Amino acid sequence: MKDRKRYLLILGIVFIILILFVVFSSQIFPHGNQLHMAESLEAPSGEHFFGTDNLGRDLLERTFNGLKISLALALIIQLISLAAGAVIGSVAGYFGGIADKLYVMVQNVLMSFPSIIASLCLIAMLGTGIRTLIIALSLLGWVTYARLVRSEVLIIKESDFIMGTKSIGASNGYILVKHVLPNVVRPVIPMFTLMIGHTVLAISGLGFLGFGIQPPTPEIGMMIKDGVTYITRAPWMILFPGTLLSVYVLWINLLGDELREWFSPIEEINMNE
């Protein structure tokens, strides 16, 4: 247990440092979008650690600025998805009946399509842009939380303390807010963390396909797409943004996995009680 605490603490500290570096990237690197055509496709050097792109822009600056935008969007998307999924999953799991059947039907429809294809279809209908990206990924993301919350609520609502609360005349709304939702928080936290990394990759994938954040706003997927054209002349245009993206997503996933392991024993104890 002590080793797990130490490992989780290290993961958390490094994660916070990485996030702070991204958050303040605009102050650290304030000129990421400035064009310097005379310096285009320069190899990594002391002046440009990641080299420059085809327009002479510093790749280190653009990569960190792009990561900041992707992480901010991922956080917004997951907060919206979590709020919607928690409400829908709680109502479906607690009340059952028509609400639950309707939820299951919608869930089956949404999950029958690959998420990337569904996202492309929504963006094709709504148009590209940051707002559309948030709408499209949120409309698809809530199902993950709703399914998790519903499964937890189905178990919790049959517990003795919920039955006892009902017997003293407590309203369904009170029970949901006071007793059910607080007991769903633990499994949701690691899921939320893992989905942040998943969403960052989804944003980058859509950007690579040309359906994500549009230029001149820096975005990792679009930067990698631009680098494909110059892969033989300037491989650093793909190597450094792709590597940094992988490192951030890997660290988020490691933190999410460790949080899931951390909360699992607590969940088992609570259920046994």
What are these model-predicted stretches?
Residues 1, 34-77, 226-242:
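Periplasmic/extracellular loop-to-transmembrane helix junction in inner-membrane transport proteins
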Residues 1-30, 106, 185:
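N-terminal signal-anchor/first transmembrane alpha helix
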Residues 78-79, 86, 90, 128-178, ...:
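Membrane-cytosol interface at the C-terminal ends of specific transmembrane alpha-helices
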